């Protein structure tokens, strides 16, 4: 098993579904007990786990650890290291939403998710949150979000 790269799993930014998921309202306790890493949100396609999950500064981050126990996991690890797969997506149970105008941002077309529960994280080809992408490699910060520059 190789050392993972820290990734942003989610933050408060607007996603492709026209909504936002507030990190402050996200419960990660159960997920921390079973930090499963899936491929494309498919149960049964476990490819590893998420190590060192952190909730701070309005975002959830962690390190992806590939178990290399299946051909799929080996392939995903290689593609992740190469950079052809670099996005993750949070599997969430939505517990509460709000249409409060103070919680809406420009371009938002759906209510804000104010309470949720993280139950899985997936390596995906195209994620809903443009900011859910690799944050650092070899100790150097990499910013590839929609409004950021790539060093």
Task: Give, region by region, the residue ranges found by the protein language model.
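Signature of dsDNA virion morphogenesis modules
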Residues: 1-147
């Amino acid at each position: 098993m190789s050392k993972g790269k820290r990734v942003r799993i989610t933050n408060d930014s607007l996603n492709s579904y026209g909504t936002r998921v507030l990190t402050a309202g996200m419960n990660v306790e159960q997920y921390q007990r079973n930090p499963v890493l899936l491929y494309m949100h498919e149960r049964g396609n476990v490819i590893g786990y998420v190590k060192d999950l952190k909730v701070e500064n309005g975002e959830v981050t962690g390190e992806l650890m590939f178990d290399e126990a299946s051909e799929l996991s080996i392939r995903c690890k290689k593609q992740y290291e190469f950079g052809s797969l670099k996005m993750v997506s949070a599997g969430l149970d939505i517990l509460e939403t709000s249409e409060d105008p103070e919680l809406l941002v420009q371009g938002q077309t759906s209510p804000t998710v104010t309470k949720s529960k993280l139950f899985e994280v997936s390596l995906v080809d195209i994620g809903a949150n443009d900011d859910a992408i690799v944050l650092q490699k070899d100790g150097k910060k990499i910013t590839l979000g929609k409004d950021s520059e790539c060093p």
